[in-house]
Amino acid sequence: MERARDRLHLRRTTEQHVPEVEVQVKRRRTASLSNQECQLYPRRSQQQQVPVVDFQAELRQAFLAETPRGG
């Protein structure tokens, strides 16, 4: 019984400590990635590219809504 308790205790302590380290690593990675992306691609190009896709989708929906079905 004592061994089982020790295993459970070890499991709980490791589960508590490991995610904190993972979160810190993920934050560092995302921060470094965002910095690299800002340097590689200027924000103007990103802002211009994204609305075009939405605009095309809106046009397609409006066109499908206006065209009579079956005809």
Curated annotation (Swiss-Prot):
The keyword Nucleus applies. Its main location: nucleus. It is found in: Nucleus. Expressed in heart, skeletal muscle and lymphoblasts (at protein level). Expressed in brain, pancreas, heart, liver, lung, kidney and skeletal muscle. GO terms for cellular component: nuclear speck; nucleus. The keyword Zinc-finger does not apply. GO terms for molecular function: ATPase binding. It holds the Pfam family SNURF. It comes from the Eukaryota. Belongs to the SNURF family. This is SNRPN upstream reading frame protein. It comes from Homo sapiens.
